[in-house]
């Protein structure tokens, strides 16, 4: 029988891998945003997004833009597909984090 610690460790590994995928997709989205949507790139401080002095309100602006699916009206298909991917990966990673935390309290 598989121990609870093994299951918890496997969930942690899967969660970390999915968060890494999310951050990689987010970096790619910001890079594509520079050409596809320069105004939004400036609004979310694309150049300083992942720095220690990044502005949290500007990061929340990108989160609300993706959450409300405002990108569906954009003309660039690559940009909209990246926004969809970032949104799906965020939902998946958040759900996995919740399951991992829940299972850590149960095990």
From Swiss-Prot:
Cited InterPro entries: Universal_stress_protein_B
Pfam families the UniProt entry points to: UspB
Protein's membrane topology: Multi-pass membrane protein
Alphabetic keyword roster: Cell inner membrane, Cell membrane, Membrane, Transmembrane, Transmembrane helix
The organism of origin for this protein: Vibrio atlanticus (strain LGP32) (Vibrio splendidus (strain Mel32))
Subcellular location(s) of the protein: Cell inner membrane
HAMAP family in alphabetical order: UspB (MF_01088)
Listed name of the protein: Universal stress protein B homolog
GO cellular component, one term: plasma membrane
Family affiliation: Belongs to the universal stress protein B family.
Coiled-coil ranges (or none): none
Transmembrane intervals: 6-23, 89-106
